[in-house]
């Protein structure tokens, strides 16, 4: 398997939406859905990728806003999220009260669990539950890459000042699960540039 990772970012929040593709089979997944879903749709079409699933690292509005558009573009592919945040997608319940109602309401959501291997075509992701920014935050590892959502960023970590956040759990999850990965593991975050586990281990001021 030869993986190709491409990123699109919306202009409002700079939220990253990823297309992860097996270049040999064209099987692909989209990780997170930002406010400009047309960007990743066009990218997938240009690549000739066959999107098999949409995986969510968490359910902040800026990471799920384009779910309906992605479903329309790619057909009724599975949408997978941690059980703790399933209601946000199924019932449109806002994770953050300041956002108000969310027009998702997709009733056939698949759940992700710690330690699970999620398979989408020829792609296999290991699920790492990394809560703290949100209760059901997950990181998704495949080969030498890990997609960390809003848990770990280049030089920073996720916010934990929300009512349903937990700063101690966030740091513990990063230390025990993400920093346990090889130094050369490439980190793709929910916002900002890519980094590596080794770089964050050595230089991230929130983890020193």
Task: Describe each PLM feature range.
Residues 2, 76-77, 108, 124, ...:
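A generic structural signal for alpha->beta connector loops
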Residues 2-47, 139-149:
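Conserved beta-strand hairpin/beta-sheet module of binuclear metal-dependent hydrolase folds
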Residues 8-10, 74, 107-109, 129-131:
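Short Gly/Pro-enriched turn/cap motifs at secondary-structure boundaries
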Residues 18, 110, 115-116, 138, ...:
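Residue-level detector of beta-strand structural context in well-folded domains
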Residues 20, 57, 130:
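Conserved S/T- and glycine-rich ATP-binding loop of Class I adenylate-forming
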Residues 26, 49, 93-98, 102, ...:
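Metallo-beta-lactamase
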Residues 31, 79-83, 148-149, 189:
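Hydrophobic residues in well-ordered beta-strands that form the structural core
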Residues 35-119, 202-206:
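Active-site HxH/HxHxD metal-binding segment of metal-dependent hydrolases
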């Amino acid at each position: 398997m030869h993986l190709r990772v491409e990123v699109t970012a919306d202009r409002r929040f700079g939220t990253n939406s990823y297309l992860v593709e097996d270049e040999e089979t064209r099987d692909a997944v989209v990780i997170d859905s930002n406010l400009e879903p047309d960007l990743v749709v066009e990218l997938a079409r240009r690549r000739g990728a066959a999107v098999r699933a949409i995986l969510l690292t968490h359910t902040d509005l800026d990471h799920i806003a384009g779910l309906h558009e992605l479903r329309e573009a790619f057909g009724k592919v599975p949408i997978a999220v941690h059980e703790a945040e399933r209601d946000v997608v199924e019932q449109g319940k806002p994770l953050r009260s300041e956002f108000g109602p969310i027009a998702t309401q997709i009733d056939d959501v698949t759940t992700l669990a710690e330690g699970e291997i999620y398979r989408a075509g020829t792609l296999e992701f290991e699920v790492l539950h990394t809560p703290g920014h949100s209760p059901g935050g997950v990181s998704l590892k495949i080969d030498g890459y890990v997609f960390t959502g809003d848990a770990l960023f280049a030089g920073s970590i996720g916010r934990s000042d929300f009512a349903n956040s937990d700063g101690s759990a966030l740091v513990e999850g990063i230390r025990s699960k993400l920093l346990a990965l090889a130094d050369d593991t490439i980190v793709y975050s929910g916002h900002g540039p890519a980094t590596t586990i080794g770089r964050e281990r050595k230089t991230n001021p929130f983890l020193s």
